[in-house]
Amino acid sequence: MKKDIHPKLHKATVRCHCGYESELYSTIGEEVSTEICSNCHPFYTGKQRFVDTAGRIDRFKKKFANFDAASKVKGN
C-alpha cells in the first residue's frame, strides 16, 4: 500500500436523543448526533411511536390541501 494516501481514522461517538451512545471509527468527525437509532426505533423496539420531527406531514397536507378541489374545477 502507498503511504500517506489514506484518510485518518478518528474514534467517533454517536449520540442519539434517547440517550444511547456508541463508539465507532470514522474519517469524518469525532462526534455525531442523531434523532433516532436502533435503540429507540419502532421497528426494533416493537412499540408504535409517531416520529415526525421535521413537520413533514404538516407540510405535505398544506401543500396538497387544495389538490382534489383544483382537479374537480379543471374537469379531470
Curated annotation (Swiss-Prot):
PROSITE patterns: RIBOSOMAL_L31. One of its GO terms (cellular component) is ribosome. Its cofactor is Zn(2+). Zn(2+) binds at C16, C18, C37, C40. GO terms for molecular function: metal ion binding; rRNA binding; structural constituent of ribosome. The keyword Ribonucleoprotein applies. Disulfide bonds: none annotated. Binds 1 zinc ion per subunit. Pfam families: Ribosomal_L31. InterPro entries: Ribosomal_bL28/bL31-like_sf, Ribosomal_bL31, Ribosomal_bL31_A, Ribosomal_bL31_sf. The keyword 4Fe-4S does not apply. GO terms for biological process: translation. Keywords: Metal-binding, Ribonucleoprotein, Ribosomal protein, RNA-binding, rRNA-binding, Zinc. HAMAP family: Ribosomal_bL31_1 (MF_00501). Belongs to the bacterial ribosomal protein bL31 family. Type A subfamily. Binds the 23S rRNA. This is Large ribosomal subunit protein bL31.
